[in-house]
Amino acid sequence: MESLFIFAFGMMLSSASALSCIPCVPEECEDPGPCEYGKVLDPCQCCLICRKGPGEICGGPWNLQGVCAEGFACITLSGNPVMNLNGGGQEVGRCRKKY
């Protein structure tokens, strides 16, 4: 019984940090218009959104704050790259030129 409780609690924790996406209907996506730094699919992998440019906010959970343009990296205020593993890091950063 205790193992069932631990399993259920673990499932609650994992679902609390999951990204919920509605079913994708590409026809309902808004056109982002011209994007100076290119386009990328949104965090739900459905609609196109503009990539972020130099100095713009990026990262966060599932990269909800945006993805940097090609040749740029999302760098935290502490100077570390935002980790992008299984849904992105929790930290927000700014787009900086890769060297």
Swiss-Prot record:
InterPro entries (alphabetical): Growth_fac_rcpt_cys_sf, IGFBP-like, IGFBP_rP_mac25
GO biological process assignments: innate immune response; regulation of cell growth; regulation of signal transduction
Signal peptide span: 1-18
Record flagged with keyword Disulfide bond: yes
Residues bearing attached sugar chains per UniProt: 20
Predominant localisation class: secreted
One cellular component (GO) term of this entry: extracellular region
Key words of the record: Disulfide bond, Glycoprotein, Immunity, Innate immunity, Secreted, Signal
Other remarks on this protein: Does not reveal bactericidal activities against E.coli and S.aureus.
Name used for this protein in its record: Single insulin-like growth factor-binding domain protein-2
Source organism of the structure: Cupiennius salei (American wandering spider)
